[in-house]
């Protein structure tokens, strides 16, 4: 074989080797956190298999007819595990909400780093990159740390009943078409798998109006609602009656109205989008009335 041919083969082999090394590094980049994830699942499994609580001590009450007072005393009881009679009627608790976020970071790599370092104490079930690639960080049945302090209707612990979906977006730019396409596909899967009601697809700002503004006004909520993910007002709007109370309507929809201005701004970020001031125009009231009637 000619010397030039040998050099060509060597260059090709070098490129192939470099590609394999790079691929291996990419695959193993999160090997440490993947291992920690599995270890944490084992810990949770042990917690589920732990003995039931000890029986509580019995109390006895003695009435003194002379003083007219009742004395309560504790009967000593040997600690023992409560009796267990295992029922066969159970399954895993399933998520009932999906909360959509934008990452407010400048790159997918930065977001994945944030979600995999120990000190951040924040996570989501899914992250969708600008190119539409979907990353699953948590099993759907695991309680993620994405909602934080928030409230929707009477629910005050959204983390326990929701899935968190993060979109790689800094909050100042439109969402990409591949990203939204992947999101719609993912939401369709989650909705069918867990029978999540259409109204239960909401944004982070909806549940935490005093402190969150994601997803931003660029987010296509109407497009999602047309596919069955979230609410949207009717095309033909009605003028609300004179006795219509917007604060009550916001509360009935689900918003936390303890800070009314913040609730109005969150509502407008979701449904109006081109104006997120705390004042309600006639148009805003008609939109709110349409949603309230649903």
Predicted features along the sequence, with ranges:
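Bacterial N-terminal signal peptides that target proteins for export
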Residues: 2-13
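Short alpha-helical segments used as structural interaction elements across diverse proteins
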Residues: 7-8, 133, 265
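Hydrophobic alpha-helical segments, especially transmembrane helices
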Residues: 11-12, 102, 269
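Bacterial N-terminal signal peptides
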Residues: 12-23
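Basic/polar, cationic surfaces and motifs that engage anionic cell-wall
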Residues: 25-43, 47-50, 176-294
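Active-site-adjacent loop/helix surface patches within enzyme catalytic domains
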Residues: 32-91, 96-195
């Amino acid at each position: 074989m000619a010397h030039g041919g040998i050099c060509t083969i060597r260059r090709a082999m070098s490129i192939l080797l470099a590609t394999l090394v790079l691929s291996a590094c990419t695959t193993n980049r999160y090997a440490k956190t993947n291992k920690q994830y599995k270890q944490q699942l084992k810990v949770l499994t042990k917690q589920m298999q732990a003995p039931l609580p000890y029986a509580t001590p019995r109390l006895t009450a003695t009435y003194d007819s002379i003083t007219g007072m009742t004395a309560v005393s504790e009967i000593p009881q040997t600690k023992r595990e409560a009796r267990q009679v295992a029922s066969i009627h159970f399954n895993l608790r399933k998520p009932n909400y999906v909360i959509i976020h934008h990452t407010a970071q400048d790159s997918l790599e930065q977001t994945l780093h944030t979600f995999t370092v120990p000190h951040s104490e924040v996570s989501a079930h899914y992250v969708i990159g600008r190119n539409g690639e979907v990353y699953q960080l948590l099993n759907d049945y695991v309680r993620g740390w994405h909602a934080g302090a928030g409230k929707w209707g009477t629910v005050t612990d959204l983390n326990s009943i929701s899935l968190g979906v993060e979109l790689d977006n800094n909050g100042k730019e439109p969402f990409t078409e591949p990203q939204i396409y992947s999101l719609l596909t993912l939401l369709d899967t989650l909705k069918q798998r867990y029978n999540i009601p259409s109204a239960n697809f909401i944004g982070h700002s909806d549940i935490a109006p005093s402190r969150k503004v994601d997803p931003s006004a660029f987010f296509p909520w109407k497009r999602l609602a047309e596919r069955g993910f979230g609410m949207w007002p009717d095309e033909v709007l009605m003028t609300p009656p004179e006795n219509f109370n917007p604060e009550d309507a916001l509360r009935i929809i689900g918003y936390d109205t303890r800070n009314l201005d913040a609730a109005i701004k969150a509502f407008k970020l979701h449904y109006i989008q081109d104006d997120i001031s705390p004042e309600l125009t006639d148009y805003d009231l008609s939109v709110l009335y349409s949603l309230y009637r649903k």
